[in-house]
């Protein structure tokens, strides 16, 4: 870890006060409170860290902590969150925001997310937030967008391809082309739509999520979750869904 020895398994960087008096996850929470009501903010977390995070952000209702039995990468985690959100509101728009991002300019963030929400209201699509690159970074994945396919909503473009973390020479070519954005791992879509995409492209994960969904709100939930989670294969949302789906768009951000 870049923050070792401060950042360890029991105290990940999300719980470090790297930028002042507040932890990274508290800063993320503060940012989200500008765009969402308190009861609509969820935390996907391991059981080991849930108490630490709840102590740091006691405002978030305990029932909004979605516990992952074990880490299985982003696709299963997002699918599990989508289940809980869809159960509460079948028409809900959900955003996915890592808790360890440094974002300067909360008003810019709010505007970008508002535009992304407009887009997913207009058509059934998946939105990924792309950061305009300032140097040829090799530590990020990249999104290639089609500048000729600009949507009616400000800053939204059709995605051409996703690229894994490149070598420096490739990253330099990406920057020169002007067609690539950093993949920030932030997404906006309707819960229903991402669950449909999981059904299309990740049928085994969908089957497990289906069983978990049926157990939501029952005494059997934790037993079913643990059983099905054992069957789930680790996979990123990028590889599992976004690189395969046809209805993927990006919105350019400069925060």
Where are these regions (language model features)?
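Short beta-strand segments
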Residues: 44, 95-98, 128-132, 163, ...
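Conserved beta-strand scaffold positions in the cores of enzyme catalytic domains, especially
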Residues: 65, 126-128, 250
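Conserved N-terminal catalytic core of the sugar/cofactor nucleotidyltransferase
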Residues: 2-5, 9, 17-98, 102-114
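Conserved donor-nucleotide/metal-binding helix-loop-beta segment in metal-dependent transferases, i.e.
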Residues: 102-137, 144
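Structural signal for hydrophobic packing residues in well-ordered secondary-structure cores
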Residues: 29, 33-36, 57, 89, ...
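Catalytic core of tubulin tyrosine ligase-like
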Residues: 142-255
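A short acidic, often aromatic-flanked loop/helix-cap motif at beta-alpha or helix-coil junctions
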Residues: 71-76, 135-137, 168-170
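Solvent-exposed alpha-helices and their adjacent loops that cap or buttress functional pockets
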Residues: 34-36, 87-89, 95-96, 119-122, ...
């Amino acid at each position: 870890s870049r923050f070792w020895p401060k950042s360890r398994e029991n105290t990940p960087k999300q719980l470090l006060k790297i930028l002042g008096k507040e932890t990274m996850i508290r800063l993320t929470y503060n940012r989200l409170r500008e765009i969402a009501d308190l009861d609509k903010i969820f935390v996907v977390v391991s059981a080991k860290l849930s108490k630490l995070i709840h102590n740091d952000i006691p405002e978030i209702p305990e029932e909004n902590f979605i516990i992952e039995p074990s880490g299985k990468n982003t696709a299963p985690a997002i699918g599990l969150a989508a289940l809980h959100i869809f159960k509460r509101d079948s028409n809900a728009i959900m955003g996915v925001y890592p808790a360890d991002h440094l974002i300067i300019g909360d008003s810019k963030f709010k505007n970008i997310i508002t535009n992304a929400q407009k887009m997913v209201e207009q058509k059934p699509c998946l939105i990924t937030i792309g950061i305009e690159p300032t140097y040829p970074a090799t530590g990020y994945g990249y999104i290639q967008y089609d500048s000729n396919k600009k949507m009616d909503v400000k800053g939204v473009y059709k995605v051409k391809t996703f690229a894994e973390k490149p070598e420096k020479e490739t990253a330099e070519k990406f920057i020169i082309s002007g067609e690539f954005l950093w993949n920030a791992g932030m997404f906006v879509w309707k819960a229903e739509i991402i669950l449909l995409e999981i059904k299309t492209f990740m049928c085994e994960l969908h089957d497990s999520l289906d069983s978990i969904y049926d157990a939501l709100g029952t005494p059997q939930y934790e037993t079913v979750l643990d059983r099905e989670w054992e069957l789930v294969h680790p996979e990123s949302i990028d590889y599992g869904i976004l690189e395969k789906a046809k209805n993927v768009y990006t919105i350019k951000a400069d925060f």
